[in-house]
Amino acid sequence: MEIIKKSSDELTMKQMYDLTKSPEIQKVSDNDGALLQVDAWALYKDTDKDGNTREILSILDNEAGAIATNSATFTRDFMEIIEMCLDCGAEVQHVKISSGTSKAGRKFYTCVYVD
């Protein structure tokens, strides 16, 4: 596992475990419409069971637990929200998981900035 970016350099061991290794990590696709409090997050590379390297975004909500995805759309949109918050001197507090259907008819997931 290789950490690409994370919400803070001061994440605890428990937060890093919850974000990256916990068997209780939930899928974004199982939480469509959910409002997440962004207590911590990590973007990292991991290897799947077939040996393929995947980029995974994991968001920790201290109430709901960690929710992760390898969706490029969700990850891109979340990281754009993070960058916009940094540019404005703000911190992202909440995002909503949202879904849509692509032109090809496939379901995709993204996130919406709430506050």
What is each PLM-predicted segment?
Residues 1-64, 104, 113-115:
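OB-fold ssDNA-binding interfaces and closely related basic DNA-contact patches used
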Residues 18, 45, 75, 79, ...:
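Compositionally biased, intrinsically disordered low-complexity regions enriched in proline and serine
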Residues 29-31, 76-96:
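Short nucleic-acid-contacting surface segments enriched for D/E, G, S/T with interspersed K/R
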Residues 63-78, 82-83:
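Disulfide-stabilized netrin-like
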Residues 88, 96-115:
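Short, charged beta-turn/beta-strand-edge "cap" motif at the junction between a beta-strand
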